[in-house]
Amino acid sequence: MLQPKRTKFRKTHKGRNRGLAQNGNKVSFGTFGLKATGRGRMTARQIEAARRAMTRHVKRQGKIWIRVFPDKPITNKPLEVRMGKGKGSVEYWVAEIQPGKVLYEMEGVSEELAREAFDLAARKLPFKTTFVTRTVM
């Protein structure tokens, strides 16, 4: 599972996920990409599940890039614990996703196969996505 090796602070504020993706909104490495059209949180488990689905579908040919990293800790208090007594312990890590962010990229496979693989990956994710291709200037 993806998570940072070390962080400056163990726990973070909740924050708000607003606006559009300013960075990572173009296909940079591969030929095809999976771009988020909705917003939400993508857990490390979801990132891995989508990666596995794509890798299995393309039968490990071509190359896949993961363009997101879960760098935000999400805390949780145990069941049946009263309020107060501090913030809960870190349960899992998420990547905050804004619309326009490219999540995965792929090259070395046909467009049809890439579309099918990205469709399988999109079913593992909690927001809407779209298939994009690299635009050559």
Curated annotation (Swiss-Prot):
Keyword rRNA-binding included in the entry's annotation: yes
UniProt region (Disordered), positions on chain: 1-23
Please give a single GO biological process term from the UniProt record.
Answer: translation
Q: Subunit structure, briefly?
A: Part of the 50S ribosomal subunit.
Instruction: Briefly state the protein's biological role.
Output: Binds 23S rRNA and is also seen to make contacts with the A and possibly P site tRNAs.
Task: Select a single GO molecular function from the record's annotations and give it.
Answer: structural constituent of ribosome
Q: Could you identify this protein by its name?
A: Large ribosomal subunit protein uL16
Family per similarity comment: Belongs to the universal ribosomal protein uL16 family.
Q: CDD domains this protein is in?
A: Ribosomal_L16_L10e
Keyword match tRNA-binding: yes
Under the heading InterPro entries, the entry gives: Ribosomal_uL16, Ribosomal_uL16_bact-type, Ribosomal_uL16_CS, Ribosomal_uL16_dom, Ribosomal_uL16_sf
Keyword terms, alphabetized: Ribonucleoprotein, Ribosomal protein, RNA-binding, rRNA-binding, tRNA-binding
State where composition is biased (Basic residues).
Answer: 1-17
What cellular component terms from Gene Ontology apply here?
cytosolic large ribosomal subunit
